[in-house]
């Protein structure tokens, strides 16, 4: 059976654990004062991976909340992947040398494709490509801008450059609990022939069951945020759904 991983999300802004609605920095809900404590909680509930996002970093184009990511990576016996504000090789090395398992390159994939290709060649599977799309087109700079590049086009180009894993976020559904855009995630998996982790909109165990059905077609997991924070289901229940399929 194809693997399927649940990635609980810890989004950080101003040193706190927050969620944004559809990536809107003006629509923020604070869910905790300590991102590390939140990550610790998910690890205690059985998570194998934690997905951490530096929202300040994504907006400012530099590392801002990195100390929390590194503390979580060093302290917890789970894999940590991080995105947000990673623009240079120094950023990548800073995380990878301090215990982080994978770094996510997002905006750089549009603004500097040669750099991303070079990093893929150098660091291989430890680089994950984050493709965030609005109406099928790739969004950048903490979702504040939309490009004229289609998600599948960018995916194909980077798969050819060596990308093995993509995180696909449908901005329209992110933080809305309205159900994930499964079709768009599957299209990206088909276009690239690589693993795609679906992000945005997961609201119920049924959403996870639906995503799991595509595990054999390249959907390798789901990032779950707001549903866990608003008690739609527990991480234990989510893991049970995945393990029982």
From Swiss-Prot:
<comment type="pathway">
    <text>Amino-acid biosynthesis; L-histidine biosynthesis; L-histidine from 5-phospho-alpha-D-ribose 1-diphosphate: step 4/9.</text>
</comment>
<feature type="active site" description="Proton donor">
    <location>
        <position position="132"/>
    </location>
</feature>
<dbReference type="Pfam" id="PF00977">
    <property type="entry name" value="His_biosynth"/>
</dbReference>
<dbReference type="InterPro" id="IPR006063">
    <property type="entry name" value="HisA_bact_arch"/>
</dbReference>
<dbReference type="GO" id="GO:0003949">
    <property type="term" value="F:1-(5-phosphoribosyl)-5-[(5-phosphoribosylamino)methylideneamino]imidazole-4-carboxamide isomerase activity"/>
</dbReference>
<dbReference type="GO" id="GO:0000105">
    <property type="term" value="P:L-histidine biosynthetic process"/>
</dbReference>
<feature type="active site" description="Proton acceptor">
    <location>
        <position position="11"/>
    </location>
</feature>
<protein>
    <recommendedName>
        <fullName>1-(5-phosphoribosyl)-5-[(5-phosphoribosylamino)methylideneamino] imidazole-4-carboxamide isomerase</fullName>
        <ecNumber>5.3.1.16</ecNumber>
    </recommendedName>
</protein>
<dbReference type="GO" id="GO:0000162">
    <property type="term" value="P:L-tryptophan biosynthetic process"/>
</dbReference>
<comment type="similarity">
    <text>Belongs to the HisA/HisF family.</text>
</comment>
<keyword id="KW-0368">Histidine biosynthesis</keyword>
<dbReference type="InterPro" id="IPR011060">
    <property type="entry name" value="RibuloseP-bd_barrel"/>
</dbReference>
<dbReference type="GO" id="GO:0005737">
    <property type="term" value="C:cytoplasm"/>
</dbReference>
<dbReference type="InterPro" id="IPR013785">
    <property type="entry name" value="Aldolase_TIM"/>
</dbReference>
<keyword id="KW-0963">Cytoplasm</keyword>
<dbReference type="InterPro" id="IPR023016">
    <property type="entry name" value="Isoase_HisA-like_bact"/>
</dbReference>
<dbReference type="InterPro" id="IPR044524">
    <property type="entry name" value="Isoase_HisA-like"/>
</dbReference>
<dbReference type="InterPro" id="IPR006062">
    <property type="entry name" value="His_biosynth"/>
</dbReference>
<keyword id="KW-0028">Amino-acid biosynthesis</keyword>
<keyword id="KW-0413">Isomerase</keyword>
């Amino acid at each position: 059976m194809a693997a399927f991983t649940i990635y609980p999300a810890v989004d950080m802004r101003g040193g706190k654990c927050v969620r944004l609605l559809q990536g809107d920095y003006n629509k923020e809900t604070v869910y905790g004062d300590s991102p590390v404590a939140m990550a610790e909680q998910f690890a205690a509930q059985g998570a194998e991976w934690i997905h951490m996002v530096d929202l300040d970093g994504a907006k400012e184009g530099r590392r801002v909340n990195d100390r929390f990511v590194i503390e979580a990576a060093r302290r917890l016996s789970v894999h940590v992947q991080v995105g947000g504000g990673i623009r240079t090789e120094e950023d990548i090395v800073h995380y990878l040398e301090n215990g982080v398992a994978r770094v996510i390159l997002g905006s750089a994939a549009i603004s500097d494709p040669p750099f991303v290709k070079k990093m893929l060649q150098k660091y291989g599977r430890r680089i994950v490509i984050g493709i965030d799309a609005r109406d099928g087109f790739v969004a950048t700079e903490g979702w504040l801008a939309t490009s004229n590049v289609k998600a599948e086009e960018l995916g194909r180009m980077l798969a050819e450059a060596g990308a093995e894993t993509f995180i696909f976020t449908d901005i329209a559904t992110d933080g809305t609990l309205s159900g994930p855009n499964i079709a768009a995630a599957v299209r990206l998996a088909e276009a690239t022939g690589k693993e795609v982790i679906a992000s945005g909109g997961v609201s119920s165990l049924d959403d996870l069951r639906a995503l799991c059905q595509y595990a054999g077609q390249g959907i390798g997991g789901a990032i779950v945020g707001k549903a866990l924070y608003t008690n739609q289901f527990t991480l234990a229940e989510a893991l049970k759904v995945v393990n029982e399929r």
